Amino acid sequence: TKGASVLIMDPLDSTVGASIEKYAAAHGAAVIDYDRLTLGGSRKYYVSFNNVKVGNLLGAGLVSCVAAWKVSKPNVLVMYGDPTDNNATLFGQGYKAVLNPLFKAGTYKQVGKAAGTWDPPTALSEFQQQFTAHSTINAVLTPNDENAAPIITYLQRKGVKAKTFPITGQDATLVGLQNILAGYQCGTVYKPIYLEAQAAAALTLYLRAGQVPPASLVNGTTFDPTRQVQVPSVLLRPLWVTAASMAATVIRDRFVTAAQLCGGSLRTACRRARIAG
């Protein structure tokens, strides 16, 4: 109502988000979905990291870790984010593409089934239930660092040693990065948020000017299953970060500082990873 010509929104709820987008479009504003797709929405463009690729990285990271940590018979619990979140659906597509062939071949065994959630206490409860019912579980695909952290703490209290029980993560949180350095998490998917913000800003300038953004910016599409349409998308490349690549990624980008990362018992691990703390 105050003359905005472009609306950028990150919809936590697709039903509410779709209503907002319908209102914006009716008042002449172009809508950009930011980071998360509004299912059933009327946005013109979507800006995010390639979320299927995020899932691919999680799956491949687990596979690499299983080999590096010498887990000879991986019995894997696959965990998911909230099923109402389209990003969680895309992450799942990505890591199932990596893991399902291994399950089918018998190289890996899928054990248990946990309800999807983004709530860490609920994720821990789901893991505990599955771990109690299936004591052979020795690797977990967790979709983000926040869900992984309480599971790692639980396993540590159970006496699980470093580099014996592969666990994955996403978002490059401080705790997640520290768990990686300590040898309790395989790696994390890092999404440089400044690139996402820059892409949204660039797209906004084209829309405000009434111009069609170039293919060098809008480089893909994302399917909206509610409307059965492909949404023109800016899809950015996520990165898999391990202890060996922290210095060249999250530290270089100042996403976290060495001082934040390398306190106490992690000083030796930071020196080993060539992170000056």
Residue ranges and their predicted role:
Residues 1-277:
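A residue-level marker of the well-folded mature domains of exported/periplasmic proteins
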